[in-house]
């Protein structure tokens, strides 16, 4: 899985690879991240490779994985039911999906990361996964440079 942690330098949003699962968990579960509001949480990108200078902005090289949000309206009467169904739904399709990660998002749903299907664009991969899982395609989240605010495991 391609996982890049986002950081800022001189006002520019840069990214560097996460070394391994241990580092990923340390970043995600750090005390600073436990007390942060959503917009100050650790940010990750799973869908692209950084530019030569490490910058995220304008990145065009696809990684081998795709990050996707599965979100629901918390005000909907069936919100809790839908949230409870997602883990079983995703895990039931993990082989076909090429699932690499499933985690709760900071607000109203889940993040998944899956293997990129060769020959499909980012948007086509997201639409394919949405159809496979029977969840709504998020039209606003199709850019490869999309970042994911990553909450600690206890949120």
Predicted regions and their residues:
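Histidine-centered divalent-metal-coordination microenvironment in nucleic-acid enzymes
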Residues: 67-68, 96-121, 125, 146-151
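DNA replication initiation on ssDNA origins
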Residues: 1-64
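Catalytic "initiation/cleavage/transfer" segments centered on a nucleophilic residue
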Residues: 118-119, 133-155
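Catalytic micro-motifs at enzyme active sites that drive phosphoryl/nucleotidyl and oxygen chemistry
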Residues: 53-58, 87-106, 135-138
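Helical (often loop-to-helix) elements that flank the catalytic cores of nucleotide-handling enzymes
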Residues: 78-93, 114-137
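Short glycine-/aliphatic-rich beta-strand segments at the starts of folded cytosolic domains
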Residues: 55-81
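Long, low-complexity interaction regions most often at the N-terminus
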Residues: 2-3, 13-16, 96-97, 122, ...
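A broadly used, surface-exposed interaction patch
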Residues: 38-46, 53, 74-95
């Amino acid at each position: 899985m391609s996982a890049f942690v986002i950081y800022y330098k001189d006002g520019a949003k840069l990214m560097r690879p996460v070394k391994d699962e241990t580092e990923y968990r340390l970043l995600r579960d750090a005390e600073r991240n436990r007390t942060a509001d959503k917009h100050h949480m650790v940010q990750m990108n799973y869908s692209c490779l950084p530019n030569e200078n490490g910058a995220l902005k304008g990145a065009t090289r696809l990684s081998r994985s795709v990050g996707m949000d599965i979100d629901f309206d918390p005000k909907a009467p069936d919100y809790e039911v839908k949230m409870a169904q997602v883990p079983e739904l995703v895990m039931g399709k993990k082989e076909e999906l090429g699932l690499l990660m499933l985690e709760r998002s900071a607000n109203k749903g889940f993040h998944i990361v899956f293997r990129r299907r060769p020959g499909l664009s980012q948007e086509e991969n997201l639409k394919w996964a949405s159809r496979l899982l029977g969840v709504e395609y998020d039209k606003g989240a199709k850019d490869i440079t999309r970042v994911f605010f990553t909450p600690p495991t206890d949120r």
